[in-house]
Amino acid sequence: MGESVLEEESRHLRQVHQRIGQALEQAKESVQKSDREYMDTKRYMVEHRGDIDPHEMFQNELLLKQTDRTGAMAVEILERLKKLKDSPYFARIDFCEAGQGEPFSYYIGRFALNHDREPLVFDWRAPVSGMFYDCEVGPAAFQAPDGRIQGELTKKRQFKIRGGKMEYALETSSHIQDDVLQKELSHTSDEKMKSIISTIQKEQNRIIRNENQGTMIIQGVAGSGKTSIALHRIAYLLYRFKNRLSAKNVTILSPNRVFGDYISNVIPELGEEPIYELSFEELAEIQLEGRMGFEPEQDLDQEGDADESRSGDPGESRGKSRSSDPGRGERERFKSTLEFVRLMDAYIEMLPDMVFAPKDYTFGRFRADAKWIGKRFKAYGTFPVKRRLLMVADDIRDRFDTENIMEDELPRQGGILKSLASMLTMKNTLAVYRDFYEKIGKKELFVMADKKTLEWADVYPFLYLHAAFEGLKESGITRHLVIDEMQDYTPVQYAALNRMFPCQKTILGDFGQFIHPNHLHTLEDLLHLYEGAEFVRLNKSYRSTYEIMTFAGHIRAASGLEPVKRHGDVPGLVSCRNEEEELCRIMDLIRDFRSGDNASLGIILKTHREAAELYDLLSEEFEVHLIEPESTRFSSGISVTSVKMAKGLEFDQVIVPHASDRNYRTDHDRSLLYIACTRAMHRLTLTFSGKRTGFID
């Protein structure tokens, strides 16, 4: 009887492990050698500090830096080998190149591994590895650096290796076998997002390996894996263009620090350095540092249409809501539209002529007339107004130097700049921003929180005008920007971002998961801002069971959504007589969770305030984590949070409290409830007192 696939592959795995073990010993020796050489050089420099001439000292410093770099590389190789030992590869393809006699076996893993210059494992991003994701057994091809390679794929296998042990080895003719995908999707969620290289689907692979240099916009339904795909795309681009793109050249803009922590493992897990990540608020702080303050973005229960308390009494709303500031909602809606950007663009086009009134400049016998100064100012039309003044000041000095026959003292640039600044009719961006609202006849739509504090809705419009008047801090190092949760940002925020980051972008999100009741922009508005961008849709949802996604589909129909047919429990509805009983039932559900196999439970409430109140009650009996706007870490276990903070996260099990018709009743509430329910992977329960929301009837 012939050897089974599992026996054959287990034997091969033992051979690979043996070679990894040898490589590990060599790597450990390299690390120790580098440490010894570094310490020896350092000791020599200290002991002979007074005796070494400057040239030798310089050579020793160079040697020290080189030894340090070598040691860092050795440590990196060692860490990579440790990861490979646990799970060296996840697939095998046998490919016979046209004109060649025998097929070659390619084992595919997270990292490449060579032994005696022979490849043992190929990086999942290598050109040949793409056939695993794209091709079935039969005629196949891949794009190599030297051209397209044709041939035949004679074998495809998939493996699960964990802790160095082969759990399964399956023969397959197609891409990812359904049972493999089902096994991976049915696992409990780990503490943070993990790589998906063993289950990347064909349509996902096309996005990941897309090498176009422009902007890509990904519209993906809940659970489609869009964030993970975007991160894998970055890892692929870092591999493919390693000579001109490194991790320090990539920035991720995410909704909050918790989400940034949640996704932080993916890129390092794929063998790359961590990526710089920041939020829109942090970016605004960098740009406005020392100039203006701003209010943080309002909680949902502080926004006009978002929430009246669960009692149904609008007067019980917390915070600075519509009852205390009825104009806030109108201001936010006006500034969230594409038309608002068009108004700003029209104003910016007129701004230089409105704000600069050139006059004659004299210094002793030297004179630069107003007409000449005006021409020089217009010549620098692509620059912000105040930067143009610097350039005109340089031109005046150059002209003075040329015409200075009598060799008079050269005027100081600061003095020239002061004279030019006096020709401005408005002195700072705040004055310009006020003038914009006066010019469009909407003076009442600009209200400051206090003398030096902007409302959040004004921050990015202010920065957009600041870019035209004084100039923004541009990121010269960022060559690729990733923007997640694209539907939560307004057109003017994108317009300002384009000034700060004039680079390639990957923009992703789901316009079916709106979180802001006062934002009026659409996917079409975003596509208008990025004309020529490559646009892709992801309609297949992998996160939740078929039953959960079917349930969520009754709350809000997602156009084109295709749930993977992974079956589980029907979502539970728990009716309670009052809120006291509801709290008891939630505690019972927590006890059930703790006695089961699931690793993470998300208790998702409508607002931060509701989440904080329930957390205070639950924390007396259970170990729970409160995820709030100030949080910086995501932890497994039991988390209590708001819909806004839960966006992008996933949990094995989800409880949605207060799912009553008092709490979830507006169209915006419908979207919030949909988001909360689609965070669940395996089990979903909604609790309510009184009458349940009509969205789940």
Where are the language model's segments positioned?
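Conserved helicase motor core of SF1/SF2 NTP-dependent helicases
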Residues: 248, 257-265, 269-273, 278-285, ...
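P-loop NTPase Walker
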Residues: 1-35, 39, 183-297, 320, ...
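Alpha-helical nucleic-acid-binding subdomain
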Residues: 238-481, 488-496, 504, 512
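Domain-scale macromolecular recognition modules
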Residues: 85, 91-93, 100-103, 470, ...
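Conserved phosphate/pyrophosphate-binding and hydrolysis machinery centered on Walker-type P-loop NTPases
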Residues: 186, 190, 330, 334, ...
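A structural signal for short, well-ordered beta-strand segments and their strand-loop junctions
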Residues: 92-94, 158, 217, 252, ...
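Extended, charged low-complexity regulatory segments
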Residues: 1-197, 201, 205-206, 693
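Hydrophobic side chains in beta-strands
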Residues: 93-95, 161, 346, 575, ...
